[in-house]
Regions:
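Conserved active-site tyrosine of GNAT-family acetyltransferases
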Residues: 16, 125, 130
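Conserved N-terminal entry element of GNAT/NAT acetyltransferase domains
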Residues: 1-8
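Active-site rim helix/loop that mediates acceptor-substrate recognition in acyltransferases
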Residues: 16-49, 63
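Conserved catalytic-core motifs of GNAT/GCN5-like acyltransferases
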Residues: 114-116, 131-147
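Conserved acetyl-CoA pyrophosphate-binding loop and the N-cap/start of the following alpha-helix
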Residues: 88-100
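Short hydrophobic/aromatic beta-strand element in the GNAT-like acyltransferase core
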Residues: 28-29, 40-44, 55, 81, ...
Length: 152
């Protein structure tokens, strides 16, 4: 059983480093330019013992790469820098994060939740109801991605 809840931006860095960006020098540099933006919201997943096992961040942001992928008049939130510790994958931590993110985004008035999904995560996002809305593209130092979106 996993619980997802709001966390501070600084609480995302350790898991981002361990799960998403181990090639970076330290957790302190595992930030993104919009972490402290006005509409930024950060989410952590915690196991029954209270250990922080998953993370994502949400931003009130349209896609610069594929601006036409979602209806222009629809409000959107972007799910970004999501990951879970390898030992909890397939056990519900990621699903708890996405459910929380979708509910929170809907409460903010969003119609869509979208992400730049890593190729390895395509099956997970598809199981969560996301659909592909772009062709594939390459993200430097990370690998193949596609834009995916969930209608809220």
């Amino acid at each position: 059983m996993f619980e997802a809840r709001s966390i501070a931006a600084a609480e995302t860095r350790s898991l981002r480093h361990r799960v998403l960006w181990p090639h970076k020098s330290s957790p302190d540099v595992c930030t993104i330019d919009v972490d402290e933006a006005e509409h930024a919201h950060h989410v952590g997943a915690f196991n029954a013992e209270g250990e922080h096992v998953g993370v994502c961040s949400l931003f009130h942001q349209r896609s610069d790469r594929f601006p036409e992928a979602l209806p222009i008049n629809d409000d959107v939130y972007r799910l970004r820098v999501m990951g879970t510790l390898p030992e909890v994958r397939g056990r519900g931590a990621g699903a708890a994060i996405v459910r929380y993110a979708a509910n929170w985004s809907r409460e903010q008035g969003a119609v869509w939740l979208w992400c730049d999904a890593r190729e390895a995560a395509f099956p997970f996002y598809e199981r969560m109801g996301f659909k592909f809305v772009s062709e594939g593209y390459h993200v430097s130092e990370i690998g193949p991605h596609r834009m995916m979106a969930l209608k809220l």
